[in-house]
Amino acid sequence: MKLNLHKPQKRYILILLLMAVVFLPVQFRHKAMTKLSITGLDGVTISTDAYALTADHKLMVDKDLAEQILKARIGWEKEAPLPKGIYYRDHVAVLMYHHLTDDPLMLYPGVLPAAQFDQQLQLLKQEGFHVITMKQYRQFMLDRAPVPDNAVLLTFDDGYESFYKLAFPILQKHGYTAVNFIIVSDVDHPIKHQVPKLTWEQMREMKRAGMDFYNHTYNLHNYAVVDAEGGTRPAASALLYIHDENRNELNEEYYRRVTGDLAHAERRLTEELGNTDSAIAFPYGSYNDKLLEICDSLGIQLKFNIGLGLGSRTTLNAPRINEGNRTLTPALSIQQLKQFEPPMVLTVNSRKLPLAGPPPELKNGKVLVPLDALCTGLGVEMHYDSSSGVVKLTPVSRKEAG
């Protein structure tokens, strides 16, 4: 969240207000109903409706239909209970923080006292949670590497200097690392009356000690006007209103604007910190299909939003749990990590199927399952023409499979 005020009192009031906004994610990714003509393994062609993820054309079909065309038994049920002390497995709880303080008079919910952060980390260790590095998280998500049970990734947003002065010593004390998502323009062009932000030199020092710094846009961390009435939405995920021409920007203008911003942020992070990989946290947790496509085009595979849930390989756009609220005691902050329901698992012919895309979901009383993931798990090749809606399934030959 960007803060640009002339009086400290107003500055911290604005922190409170913007913290309230930042924890409300805005998502603009959706499924569109589409007509399909599917030729199954038995050669029979069936006409049906399905849902397609608009960004990548992943198909979600009725489970009963999938069983018919694939000639397989498909299950979608809760995983067996885990042993005592293990709260989740093969998932990562990504925790989100923003600003720390050691000022006892700074009593705003979204600004966490440093002592409270220290207590949280101590309890994480005591309660059997395992803080992992960004490298471990990346390998887990992209290379199917294992992570410990009760794995946790610590992340911060906005690049406040309190990360260097307060969080960094506490992290080192516990032997932990963390990621900070930087509003890069705030580092390149510091604003005098803004809450202090990190410098490149501070980040270089911390990077040598294992901390990581990634993209929170160059200069799109703001709400911008999207209509003639002055309504606003997050600038990174909305078609902005052009006053002089009384219109919203076109898709190609949006792509050019946002691609240019994110690419510039990536370049600066590489130039100053030597980054060789990428990740992004979306401002305000807001994203849409176009923004996801832009990130993919720039090689930014790992993405983070805001939401209560665990990170898994089913999506590279992971939710993050807000642990940076001072009203949440350390004990309660840890307790909420223990409350996640056992994950649902997809099985094919009684065999657990790893997912690297959208999970099944219940819609209008029917279970929708990801057809491409099922085909991959069964060694079936799926040919899908999104323009015509024609799908053809053929077994992968042993030679091709081997």
Where are these regions (language model features)?
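Substrate-binding cleft of extracellular glycoside hydrolase catalytic domains
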Residues: Q136-Y137, D149, L153-S162, L166, ...
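Metal-dependent polysaccharide deacetylase catalytic core of the NodB/CE4 family, i.e.
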Residues: L95, L100-T101, L107, A151-V152, ...
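Primary recognition of N-terminal secretory signal peptides and signal-anchoring hydrophobic helices
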Residues: K2-I86, D90, L95, L332-G402
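Soluble non-cytosolic domains of exported or imported proteins
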Residues: D56-V61, V111-A115, E161-S162, K197, ...
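Extracellular/periplasmic catalytic domains that process cell-envelope and extracellular macromolecules
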Residues: I86-D90, A145-P148, Q172-G175, E205-R208, ...
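Extended hydrophobic/aromatic segments used for targeting, binding, or gating
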Residues: N288-P330
